[in-house]
Regions:
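RNA pseudouridine synthases
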Residues: 1-334
Length: 334
């Protein structure tokens, strides 16, 4: 028999998932048979697969030792590629016991991929480990996660969760549109300020978006709504504040390109000649502000209601200042 005391990182996890995380090569059929035969208990009572664990729960597993890792064995994890062993230093904009707002620089991945390049999740995990808030070797049931990702070429604010409960509840906040994001971007051409609506279609094979004026006959397209507020202009360029009413893949970049005012430096949707003439090699797009609306009291992150997190002195403003001073900036390509 094995006993476990649930931690904060186990809060809200299904009991069946917890059992699978602490056992090894335990057949699913035997797992559910153990539930039926009362060999899995929580606080002395029969456990049910759908039960949600609470921190402090005492979980007793009357399961043969052959299905548990040897005593003292560390959780089995795939070794990280050499590139990932030393992650970049994390820039923390806001932090509490549950979440952190991080600054993601341009070209840094949010999550790991097959390249093995540095990424924000592993950098945040390393940061928490150095603070003593997370043990990557001893914890095999949860890894700190990113709640709202940004494209690799986009910089700005990203929310990270320290625990399973925080990740679950932040994802619910995002799903119910109780988190609003604002961006700064530099456009090639001066757009009109206002709210713009269009129809979005994603080519998943090529990871490219097309924008249309109307819904398709098969109704595959999804509506997008984007707010544009022109803050400053300099020759053919505009510094704009963008508000996302909907949040779709590449929405800002593709929608502005559809309006004829693409993001400066955007390789996929942008003005290639202007990118080359200005020497801009990355998209001028930055998530500068995150605001929380009225979060329900039953959500553990309710205390964030009304909170606004801002990125101070974003680099994109300095980038625009450089364009403003450059009087040799060429006219917009027709």
């Amino acid at each position: 028999m094995k006993q476990y005391t649930a931690t904060a990182n186990d809060e809200g996890v299904r009991l069946s998932r917890f059992v699978q995380s602490v056992t090894r090569d335990f057949p699913t059929s035997l797992l559910y048979k153990s539930f039926r035969n009362k060999r899995i208990k929580v606080n002395g009572k029969k456990g049910v697969p759908e039960d949600r664990i609470k921190a402090g729960d005492l979980i007793e597993l009357y399961i043969n030792d052959e299905f548990f890792p040897p005593e003292g064995a560390k959780p089995t994890r795939k070794p990280a590629p050499k590139k990932q062993q030393n992650q970049p230093k994390v820039t923390v904009i806001y932090e509490d016991e549950n979440i952190a707002a991080l600054y993601k620089p341009t070209h840094l991945l949010c999550h790991s991929d097959r390249t093995g390049d540095a990424n924000l999740v592993d950098a945040f995990t390393q940061y928490l480990a150095q603070k003593g808030e997370y043990d990557p070797q001893g914890e095999n049931r949860f890894k700190p996660g990113i709640c709202n990702r940004l494209d690799r070429g986009t910089e700005g604010l990203v929310i990270a969760a320290k625990s399973y409960a925080a990740l679950r509840d932040m994802n619910e906040i995002i799903r119910t549109d109780l988190l609003k994001k604002e961006y700064y971007t530099i456009t090639v051409g001066i757009p009109q300020s206002g709210r713009f609506t269009a129809w979005w279609e994603h080519d998943e094979k090529n990871n490219k978006v097309s924008i249309h004026a109307h819904q398709s006959q098969d109704e595959r397209r999804k509506q997008i709504i984007t707010d544009v507020d022109v803050l400053r202009t300099a020759g053919p360029f505009a510094l704009c504040r963008i508000g996302l009413i909907t949040g779709r893949t590449h929405q800002i970049r593709a929608h502005l390109a559809y309006l004829g005012k693409p993001v400066l430096g955007d390789i996929k949707y942008g003005n290639r000649k202007m990118n080359e003439r200005t020497g801009t090699r990355t998209q001028a797009l930055c998530a500068v502000r995150i605001s929380f609306l009225d979060i329900p009291e039953e959500n553990t992150l309710h205390y964030l209601s009304g909170k606004v997190i801002k990125l101070k002195d974003p680099q994109i403003v300095k980038q625009f200042d450089g364009l403003d001073k450059n009087k040799q900036a060429p006219a917009e390509e027709k």
